[in-house]
Amino acid sequence: MDNLNDALEKLKLTGTECTSDKLDGCFDCLLQALGHNNTESSEKIQQSGILQLFASILNSQSSCASKVAHIVAEIAKNELMRIPCVEAGLIPPLVQLLHSKDQEVLLQTGRALGNICYDNHEGRRAVDQEGGAQIVVDHLRSMCTLTDPSSEKLMTVFCGMLMNYSSENDSLQTQLIQMGVIPILVDLLGVHSQNTALTEMCLVAFGNLAELESSKEQFAGTNIAEEIVKLFKKQTEHEKREIIFEVLAPLAENDAIKMQLVEAGLVECLLDVVQQTVNSEKDDDIAELKTSSDLMVLLLLGDESMQKLFEGGKGSVFQRVLSWLPSNNHQLQLAGALAIANFARNDGNCIHMVDSEIVQKLLDLLDRHVEDGNVTVQHAALSALRNLAIPVVNKAKMLSAGVAEEVLKFLRSEMPPVQFKLLGTLRMLIDAQAEAAEQIGKNEKLAERLVEWCEAKDHAGVMGESNRLLSALIRHSKSKDVIRTIVQSGGIKHLVTMATSEHVIMQNEALVALGLIAALELQAAEHDLESAKLVEVLHRLLLDERSAPEIKYNSMVLICAAMGSVPLHKEVQKLAFLDVVSKLRSHENKTVAQQASLTEQKLTVQS
């Protein structure tokens, strides 16, 4: 430490009137002290006031510049010294040094600026004001094809500097993207794939930039997919593959890049990783299995990439994914079910899969998770079944396969995501399937659960789906038994509330179901309809100018049917329905206008 004090005194006395020979010893002493105890030495250097002297030496473009920049780089390793470096005015002369032709000067300057910018807003702002990032980007562009070790080392430092400059700062990352840094980094990855340090730095840079939506288009315009898959194939170490995964996940959110990754052979790589890790109990392998299978599912979210991998149901990838369903590994079961849910995003695929007996594989999987099962697997398998049930030709086949019975086993689930998918699957299955709707609709436990879930205000999705299934059971069965079951379970009030939904489709479904109730079982339901203030709701819907034509039409149909009940008829008479309905006779929609005339006649006759 005495040597450090002596060196600092000597530097203060000499000032900027230095020659390299005279001060080399002092600078070496500072570097040695910083290497031995960075925290203590850097604080001592700052307290001595020598940082301002460094700014003057750097400004003078002295031959000492590279040594001074080196010292600044070491000082800035101490996070407490970064702001003092900015306050001492070191950034402007350091940025000017970026114009140097001397590689050692550029190397130490890049290190100094990178260290000052690390987690330091003031440092970044100062570099931004001096235009430092653009100079570094230009250097990288011009040096990209140089493969000598010193150039590769400098490019690694420059990449690191840009990352420290822009890390977790959207506006600075956007600035780098606008400067065209992405194609440069992709080229660097391609040319220098043998250089571990430089490729890792490029990957870290990609990881930072790929999170930004504005970066995706630029990435899609490069051969990033090809380069990164090529690199992935070479990697055997967990840590290296993990870095690549961190880049792939945000990139794969873009549909164009999804397709590029599929064409570059990423899926085959991921399947290999799954194969290698599936039976391992090591934490690293378990994590890698999850990441690989999750990424596979993400690639299937793109319509084009999904169809390419489906290959008419004959693709090897599709077949491999199917083999995951009977696996004993929950992660693979989950990924397999999610993959099928994604493949089942168009009718053609769904029809092929149902004809290929995939439904039974999903039912077998669900059956393994009925008692204390894995919620994510339940949710994924139900998602797949729901999607498969959408095409009309699949419904009867799936009902025959026992899908409804299997799904109903999960009625006791207390997990909203499972409840939501269960409801959606049943609703899809009974669409235009009168017999199934009647059979399922008479299930008292289901009706009770639906009524309970119709009140799940904390889970809007579950609440909405419960209401829609209640309505669907009535609309598709047109069964008195189903209506009585729903009346006994207390479901009527929820259908009336559903008629006031902000979604027109739900309003209409509720009104059609209520119309059937009034037509088929009015006496059984009249008390509940009166308690739920049905007539008031219908009056409001007809008065509301925002109500869609089909809402007005079905409200009037329901009014006519409801008048068959004495208490409901009295309610109708209390409100000025005639006035409202007569105005609707001139409605621009002919069907509404005709129904208004019929309703007016009925109101007049029965008033």
Swiss-Prot record:
Its main location: cytoplasm. Pfam families: Arm (PF00514). InterPro entries: ARM-like, ARM-type_fold, Armadillo, RAP1GDS1. One of its GO terms (biological process) is positive regulation of GTPase activity. It is found in: Cytoplasm, Cytosol; Endoplasmic reticulum; Mitochondrion. ARM repeats lie at residues 79-118, 170-211, 347-390, 391-431, 479-519. One of its GO terms (molecular function) is small GTPase binding. Weakly expressed in adult tissues with highest levels found in spleen, kidney, skin and A6 cells. GO terms for cellular component: cytosol; endoplasmic reticulum; mitochondrion. Keywords: Cytoplasm, Endoplasmic reticulum, GTPase activation, Mitochondrion, Repeat. SUPFAM superfamilies: ARM repeat. PANTHER family: RAP1 GTPASE-GDP DISSOCIATION STIMULATOR 1 (PTHR10957). Interacts with ralB. Probably interacts with the post-translationally isoprenylated (geranyl-geranylation) forms of ral proteins. Interacts with both GDP-bound and GTP-bound forms of ralA, but interaction is much stronger with ralA-GDP. Stimulates GDP/GTP exchange reaction of a group of small GTP-binding proteins (G proteins) including Rap1a/Rap1b, RhoA, RhoB and KRas, by stimulating the dissociation of GDP from and the subsequent binding of GTP to each small G protein. This is Rap1 GTPase-GDP dissociation stimulator 1-A. It comes from Xenopus laevis. The gene is rap1gds1-a.
